[in-house]
């Protein structure tokens, strides 16, 4: 089974996605919360044994520095000549946002001209699984990364847990299908509530993605920070 998660163009693209969910000026977003979401995303990729490019890890180390400076009491003030890493980061995100917007505008103009003067290219790079409105499989993965962080903490604190590696995606799909037949819809948090190991959590997530892929369930989110909901698709 080949399950693809929408790739970002780089760490700034991921950060811009996280910042834009707050729908406010870049310089007003709760930067520590954004950093924690970024780090949770990277940790989840690693836990699922997915390859993480070096540039994402470099950014992660820079973000941890910014977070520590935010949370620790200020001992020395940053001199006027020294560049504040947080301000520098926000400036880079803002600059990247402008660049991306311009790039999208140019791409749109190019596509419009192609429609007028030639046959459109028959090219499908990746068809993302759509949730509702502007939501995508990436939003589902980001929501999952938060749950993953909580479960990792639970497992770490529960010394009686014995990891299994024989969980099957097909079994998890059957389990979710049974639950949804009884309840019609369920939140993403509820999906993982009874999972007691990281392997079980990861397998359950892959089963969820597969159900979305085969259109057995639909997924929606009422707003950017509410729980994602899975609903049984009537077929």
Swiss-Prot record:
A Pfam family recorded for this sequence: SMC_ScpA
BP GO terms, sorted: cell division; chromosome segregation; DNA replication
Superkingdom assignment: Bacteria
GO cellular component: cytoplasm
Statement: the UniProt record of this protein carries the keyword NAD: no
Keyword terms of this UniProt record: Cell cycle, Cell division, Chromosome partition, Cytoplasm
InterPro entries: ScpA (IPR003768), ScpA-like_C (IPR023093)
Entry keyword Ribonucleoprotein: no
Protein localization: Cytoplasm
Chief location of this protein within or outside the cell: cytoplasm
NCBIfam families documented for this protein: PRK00104.1-2
Function text: Participates in chromosomal partition during cell division. May act via the formation of a condensin-like complex containing Smc and ScpB that pull DNA away from mid-cell into both cell halves.
Assembly notes: Component of a cohesin-like complex composed of ScpA, ScpB and the Smc homodimer, in which ScpA and ScpB bind to the head domain of Smc. The presence of the three proteins is required for the association of the complex with DNA.
UniProt similarity note: Belongs to the ScpA family.
Protein name stated in the entry: Segregation and condensation protein A
Lineage, broadest ranks: Bacteria, Bacillati, Bacillota, Bacilli, Lactobacillales
Gene that this sequence comes from: scpA
